[in-house]
Amino acid sequence: MLLQAQRLEQQGKLPEAERLYQQAIQLAGSSPLAAEAQLRLAALYMRKMERYDDALKIYEQLIKQYRTGEIAAEATLRMGELYERQMQKTADQKERNALEQKALEAYRRLENDFRDTAVAKGEGKQRLEALLRRIDERNRNHPAYLFWDVLVALTGRQPWLSYWVAIVLFTLIVLALLTPLRVAWFRSFREMKKLEPEVRRLRERYKGQELNEKIMELYKQHKVNPAAGCLPMLIQMPILIYVFYAIRLYEYQFSKGFFLWINPSLAERFPGIVGANLGQHDLPLLVLYAISLYITQRLTPVSDPAQAEQMKMMSLFMTVFMLYMMYLWRFPSAFVLYWFVSNILMTAQQLRYMKVEPEPAAPLATTTNPPEPAPAAASSNPGKNHHTRKPRRKR
């Protein structure tokens, strides 16, 4: 029946071929023959009938049903091909970019989750390489791409040296740009730290709204803005997002670079754990990043001692969350290396600033009461009666 459907497809009788494929799927039940018929039907929808949504549903169903093995790998590969075909059919640049990213994700998933299949080693690898080259060609004139290229060229484009050194240099440059913001944050923290003893005294004397008013009065007296420490952190976010974008622009070139254990030799011995290059995911580097993140979070100073335990739990939560998300999304090791180096440098910077002990602040100025009268001076001879006798009146 499949051969007959193929002949009808070659003759251009697409509706008849579609019906035969559907009949073959029903007759085959849950056997591998049904999966083959589904793949052929989805290919018919995608390549000749342009029914992309119908084809996508079949591919998603096959991936969910088979999970691993050649059938799921084939469905993943064809899903990437489908997105590329859709990309060629649209003129909207925003939509093209979104479809291109979906195709890249499908090929990346094929490379990571189905690396031992013939599909991943053959056509999947070729399609991923071709797509990355096209993206790289398009990005070559972007300022961030050119900047990366200059950093790599400084050390001669050596695979074992140039690319990770470029990441370290890039991290130093970004940290230098962020240093004024971080210094402002530490200054704000120091001012808050100086006021801690006085804030504790206010907490002992006042409650509720009156306490808040007294604390704000104290901050105003010492010209401290409690929200000033948050502003530098908020300003950093757009910069960090751009850093991620800049690394993604140069992702294809990073696949030519290695770092210590991240190389093809060890990747073959430990597949799925060690990355073959800086463009691939690497688990040991991700674990090192998570450890550095936890240490950085724990060393972040807290102005209020009552928040110390809460900060400890938040540090642990953030570490586990970031570890899970970066593992799930299979971030390229070039990006993880940037974060790892950045955490080390920021931790060193924090330790340097934390060595300086803040001086205690002056107490809150209050209205002074008039001094109480001094007690009467005691007699110099405590053994005698303090009350003097009146002299007797003469009669």
Predicted regions and their residues:
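Helix-loop-helix
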Residues: 10, 47-48, 57, 61-65, ...
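Residue signature of alpha-solenoid helical repeat architecture, marking inter-repeat boundaries
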Residues: 32-34, 70
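Alpha-helical segment of the N-proximal tetratricopeptide repeat
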Residues: 1-23, 27-28, 43-48
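Structural signature of tandem alpha-helical TPR/SEL1-like repeats
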Residues: 13-19, 36, 50-57, 92-94, ...
